[in-house]
Amino acid sequence: MSWVQVNLLARGLSRGWGSICRTVLSGTPFAQPSLQARGLHCSAVTHKDDVWLVPRPSEPQKKPIKVPAMHEDLFRPSGNGEQDKASFLNAVRSFGEHNVRKRGHVDFIYLALRKMPEFGVERDLSVYNLLLDVFPKEVFRPRNAIQRIFVHYPRQQECGVAVLEQMERHGVMPNTETEFLLIQVFGHKSYPMLKFLRMKLWFTRFKNINPYPVPRDLPQDPLDLAKLGLRHMEPDLSAKVTVYQMSLPSESTGIEDPTQPHIVGIQSPDQQAALARHNPSRPVFVEGPFPLWLRNKCVYYHILRADLPPPEEETVEEIPEEWNLYYPMQLDLEYSRSAWDNYEFDMDEVTEGPVFAMCMTGAHDQATLVKWIQGLQETNPTLAQIPVVFRLARSTGELLATTRLEGQSPPHSPPKGPEEDDEAIQAQQRQGQS
C-alpha cells in the first residue's frame, strides 16, 4: 500500500468519525437510515445559508448625513443681520472654543464650505487656512508603512481634499502656511498633500495663460460692464466705444420713457470703411442676443453683419511692400515639389460675412436696436441707404425695417416662412435699386 492510499484512507476515516460524532451530539439514533446513500466523506446535516444557530443582527438603515443643529446656529446672522468676513471668522473661532475635543469637525468644515459664498469669503486664502486649522494636529498622520499604503483616516483626508478643491475652483493659490498646516495635520504622504503639490505646480503655469485676462473685480454699473465686454471682444485697439443712450435712474419721474435702457456700441475704422464699401442693394442684418460670460456674470450683445459677397464682388487688397521688411506677410517661394505633394492644408474653415459693428443694450427689443442703428447713421451715412433686417432670437420672426424713416419705428410682422422672407428681401432690394 503506497503512502498516497494511506493518506486517502486516513482522510476518509476522519470525516466518517466526524459525521458520527455530530450525529451523537444532535440526538439522532444510529439506527435511523439516511434518506440518501451517503459516503463516509459526506455529512448527515445539509448546509443551508438561511439557517444559523445565532440569529444575524438586523442591518441598520443608512440615513443621510445631517449636520448638527448647533453647527447651523453658528452661521446664523446676528442681531445686525450682516453676513461678512468678520461674522464668518467669529463662527469658526467659536466652534473651536466651545468644542475643545473638536468632535464633528468634518461636518462643520463641510458646512463652512457651503456657507462661504453667502458670506463672500470664497476667494479669501486666510479663511481657508483657518478651516484647515480646525483639524486636530498630529492625529491623522500615518505612523508606519501599512498606514501609508492604505488610506489613513479616509473621511478626514477627503474633507481636506474638498477644501483644496474649492480653493482651486475659485482660483485661490495656496501658500506656505497652507503647506505647513497640511503637513502638521495629514503628513507628507497623504492625498491632501498630493493635491497641494499638484495645485502648486499647475497654478503657477496656468496663472497667466489667458491672453485676454478679465479683471478679478468686475464693475457693478451695467454701463461700465458693457464697455468692458465690448473691449474684451474687439481685437482692434483703435476701435471707439460710443454711448448712444444712458439708462435713467429708477427714481426719475415725469419722463416720456421712464424705462430707457442703455445703448453702448463699438466700431473700428476698418469696419466703417467696410460698411462704406458695402453694396446698398444688399441688406445688412442685426442679430442677437448672444451671451458673453465675464467670470460669473453673463452679458448679451448684438452684431450688425452682412452676408458673404459673391466671388465676383470680392476685392483682394495687395499688401504694401514696406510691410514685409521685417515680418513678411506674403512669401512666394518656389521650391521643387513632386506630383505627390499636397498643396492644401486639411483645415475646416467656415467663411462668414463681415461684421460692421457690435453693441450691448439694456433691452433686447427691436425699438431699442433701431435707436442704435440711428446712432450709427451719424458716423456711417451710407447706412441710411441700406435696408436693415432684424433677426432677433426672442422675436416671432425676421422683422424687416428700412432706416430711411428715422421718426417711425418699424412695424411688427407675424411669423413668416422662408419663402415669404426671401420674397420680402427681394422686394426690398428692388426698392433700394430704384
Curated annotation (Swiss-Prot):
Cell compartment(s), UniProt: Cytoplasm; Nucleus; Mitochondrion
Post-translational modification: Ubiquitinated on Lys-371; leading to translocation in the nucleus together with RELA and NFKB1 and expression of NF-kappa-B-dependent genes.
One GO location term (cellular component): mitochondrion
Position(s), cross-link Glycyl lysine isopeptide (Lys-Gly) (interchain with G-Cter in ubiquitin): K371
Keyword Nucleus on entry: yes
Any GO MF annotation of the entry: DNA-binding transcription factor activity
GO process terms (BP): BMP signaling pathway; cell surface receptor protein serine/threonine kinase signaling pathway; innate immune response; mesoderm formation; regulation of oxidoreductase activity; regulation of protein complex stability; regulation of transcription by RNA polymerase II; toll-like receptor 4 signaling pathway
Presequence extent in this chain: 1-48
Main location: cytoplasm
Top-level lineage group: Eukaryota
Region annotation Disordered: where it falls in the sequence: 403-434
Keywords, ordered alphabetically: Cytoplasm, Immunity, Innate immunity, Isopeptide bond, Mitochondrion, Nucleus, Transit peptide, Ubl conjugation
Classification via InterPro entries: ECIST_C, ECSIT, ECSIT_N
Assembly, per entry: Interacts with MAP3K1, SMAD4 and TRAF6. Interacts with SMAD1 only after BMP4-treatment. Part of the mitochondrial complex I assembly/MCIA complex that comprises at least the core subunits TMEM126B, NDUFAF1, ECSIT and ACAD9 and complement subunits such as COA1 and TMEM186. Interacts with NDUFAF1. Interacts with ACAD9. Interacts with TRIM59. Interacts with TMEM70 and TMEM242. Interacts (when ubiquitinated) with NF-kappa-B subunits RELA and NFKB1. Interacts with RIGI, IFIT1 and MAVS; these interactions promote RLR-mediated type I IFN induction.
Protein family per UniProt: Belongs to the ECSIT family.
Physiological role: Adapter protein that plays a role in different signaling pathways including TLRs and IL-1 pathways or innate antiviral induction signaling. Plays a role in the activation of NF-kappa-B by forming a signal complex with TRAF6 and TAK1/MAP3K7 to activate TAK1/MAP3K7 leading to activation of IKKs. Once ubiquitinated, interacts with the dissociated RELA and NFKB1 proteins and translocates to the nucleus where it induces NF-kappa-B-dependent gene expression. As part of the MCIA complex, involved in the assembly of the mitochondrial complex I.
Protein name listed in UniProt: Evolutionarily conserved signaling intermediate in Toll pathway, mitochondrial
Species assigned in the record: Rattus norvegicus
Taxonomy of the source species: Eukaryota, Metazoa, Chordata, Craniata, Vertebrata
